[in-house]
C-alpha cells in the first residue's frame, strides 16, 4: 500500500526553497565542499529524445546511490525519507524525470526509498533505472537473477522498469559470458523485455576498449540474427579528466565513447564529477576555472562537458543536498554545451590535475562494509582532499611540513573515527575480491601506504 498521497506538479512547485533548510552537512576537516552558481530559481531542464522509445528524457538524471541518511530511535542508519521526498519534489518540478538506483545501493534501501518518493506521481511521468547486481560468483544463476528482478519490481512498486542494466561489467568477455550468457540470464532478460517488463536493456561498463569491442561484436551478431538490438543503451564513466587522463587501469573515456557512438548506442553518464573530485580540484586549477567563467560553479564545468557529446542521453548526479540540486538545475536549464575552445581549456586542466598523486576513489562504497571496520571511502576522500589542498608533504624538509602535518592529522581524526582508520587494515583483501572495485584500486596496498604515512607524521609529532 502506498503510504503517501499522489501530488500534482502544481501542488509542490516552490517547495524546494523550504527543503534546502532541512538539508545540512557537518564539515569535518578535509571533507568535500561544493559551490552553487546562483540563488535564483532554476528553469526547466533540457531533454533529449530516446532513439528507441521516442520519449523525452531529462539530460540531468538523478543518481540514487547517495540519498541522505539519518538515525532511527535505535541508532540504526536509515534513509532520511522526508528529505528524499523534498529533493525529488524539487527535481521533478524542474523537469528531472530519470532516476537511477540499484538493489545494492545504501545497503539495499535505495530502491524502496526512491519508489516512495516517486509513487506520489503518475508512473508514466518518470523513468526508473535499476540493475542486476550479481557480483558474487554464487549469484551467477538464473534463479538469482529472476529473484533480484522480482524484488526490484516489488521494492520500486511497479510492474515494469524503464531502463535495466547488467551491473558493472568490469572484467573480460569470458567473465561476461559466465555471468550473463551461459547461464541463461541474458535470454531471460530479453524475454522480459519482449513482454514489456523491461523497456530498455543495457549495461554499466568499467573495463577496457578490447572488452567493449567484443561486447559490441556480440551486440551486432544478435542484431543481424534477430533483426533487433541486443542492447538499447550503455552506462559509462565520462568526465573531463577521464576523457584523456584516466586515473586507473580503465581505458580513456574518449575511446570508449567513440566505440559506443560508432554502434549508435545512447550513453548514460555516471561519475561526471569523479565522485565529487571535479568539484573540489586543486586550488590553482579552481582559480583558473573561475577566472575563465566567474559565474559558473566547478561542478557545472563537469556536467556541461559530459552533456556536450551528442550520443549522451542522460548525465547522472547523486544530489544529496538541495544546494547541489539547485546548482545542477541551473546548469541544465537550459544546457549550454561547451565549445571546442572550452573543451581544450579543460584538457589543459586535466593535464595539470594528472600530476597530483590522487587515489581514483569515487565513493561508490562497493568495497563496504569492511569486516575490520575501516571506512575505506572516507580514508581515500580525506587523503585526496588533503593532496588537493597541499597538506601532503613529500618529506620532512618541506618548509610547510609542520603546518601540513598538523592539518592532516587533526582533520584525519575528525573525518575518520580512530577505530575506522587505515592502520586497522590487515590486508585480508575482502574489499577487492568480493566487491570488484570499479576503479580497480589496489585497496590494501593504498591502505598500507596511507597508514605508513600517518605513522610517520605521528612519530615526528612526538619527537
Q: Across the structure, where does each feature detected by a protein language model lie?
A:
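Beta/alpha (TIM)-barrel catalytic core signal, keyed to glycine-rich beta->alpha loops juxtaposed to Asp/Glu
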Residues: 169-381, 388-408, 439-445
Amino acid at each position: 500500500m502506498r503510504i503517501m498521497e499522489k501530488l500534482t506538479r502544481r501542488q509542490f512547485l516552490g517547495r524546494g526553497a523550504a527543503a534546502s533548510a532541512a538539508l545540512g552537512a557537518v564539515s569535518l576537516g578535509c571533507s568535500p565542499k561544493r559551490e552553487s552558481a546562483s540563488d535564483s530559481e532554476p528553469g526547466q531542464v533540457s531533454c533529449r529524445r530516446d532513439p528507441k522509445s521516442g520519449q523525452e528524457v531529462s539530460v540531468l538524471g538523478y543518481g540514487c546511490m547517495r540519498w541522505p541518511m539519518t538515525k532511527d530511535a535505535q541508532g540504526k542508519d536509515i534513509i532520511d525519507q522526508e528529505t528524499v521526498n523534498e529533493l525529488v519534489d524539487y527535481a521533478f518540478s524542474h523537469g528531472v524525470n530519470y532516476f537511477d538506483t540499484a538493489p545494492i545501493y545504501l545497503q539495499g534501501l535505495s530502491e524502496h526509498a526512491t519508489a516512495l518518493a516517486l509513487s506520489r506521481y503518475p508512473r508514466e511521468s518518470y523513468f526508473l533505472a535499476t540493475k542486476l547486481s550479481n557480483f558474487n560468483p554464487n549469484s551467477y544463476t538464473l534463479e538469482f537473477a529472476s529473484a533480484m528482478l522480482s524484488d526490484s519490481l516489488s521494492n520500486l512498486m511497479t510492474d515494469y522498469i524503464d531502463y535495466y542494466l547488467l551491473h558493472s561489467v568490469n572484467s573480460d568477455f569470458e567473465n561476461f559470458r559466465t555471468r550473463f550468457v551461459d547461464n541463461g540470464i541474458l535470454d531471460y532478460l530479453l524475454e522480459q523485455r519482449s513482454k514489456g517488463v523491461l523497456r530498455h536493456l543495457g549495461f554499466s561498463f568499467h573495463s577496457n576498449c578490447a572488452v567493449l569491442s567484443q561486447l559490441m561484436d556480440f551486440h551486432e551478431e544478435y542484431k543481424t540474427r534477430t533483426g533487433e538490438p541486443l542492447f538499447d543503451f550503455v552506462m559509462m564513466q565520462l568526465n573531463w579528466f577521464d576523457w584523456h587522463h584516466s586515473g586507473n587501469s580503465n581505458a580513456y573515456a574518449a575511446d570508449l565513447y567513440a566505440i559506443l557512438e560508432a554502434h549508435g548506442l545512447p550513453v548514460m553518464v555516471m561519475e561526471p564529477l569523479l565522485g565529487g573530485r571535479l568539484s573540489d580540484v586543486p586550488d590553482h586549477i579552481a582559480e583558473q576555472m573561475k577566472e575563465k567563467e566567474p559565474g559558473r560553479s566547478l561542478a557545472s564545468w563537469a556536467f556541461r562537458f559530459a552533456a556536450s557529446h551528442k550520443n549522451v542521453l542522460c548525465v547522472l548526479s547523486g544530489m544529496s543536498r538541495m544546494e547541489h540540486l539547485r546548482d545542477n538545475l541551473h546548469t541544465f536549464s537550459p544546457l549550454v554545451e561547451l565549445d571546442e575552445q572550452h573543451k581544450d581549456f579543460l584538457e589543459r586542466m586535466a593535464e595539470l590535475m594528472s600530476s597530483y598523486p590522487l587515489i581514483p576513489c569515487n565513493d561508490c562504497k562497493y568495497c563496504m562494509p569492511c569486516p575490520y571496520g575501516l571506512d575505506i571511502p572516507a580514508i581515500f576522500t580525506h587523503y585526496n582532499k588533503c593532496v588537493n589542498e597541499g597538506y601532503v608533504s613529500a618529506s620532512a624538509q618541506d618548509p610547510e611540513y609542520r603546518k601540513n602535518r598538523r592539518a592532516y592529522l587533526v582533520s584525519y581524526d575528525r573525518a575518520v573515527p580512530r577505530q575506522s582508520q587505515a592502520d586497522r587494515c590487515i590486508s585480508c583483501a575482502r574489499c577487492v575480491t568480493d566487491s570488484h572495485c570499479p576503479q580497480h584500486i589496489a585497496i590494501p596496498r593504498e591502505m598500507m601506504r596511507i597508514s605508513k604515512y600517518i605513522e610517520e607524521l605521528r612519530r615526528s609529532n612526538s619527537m
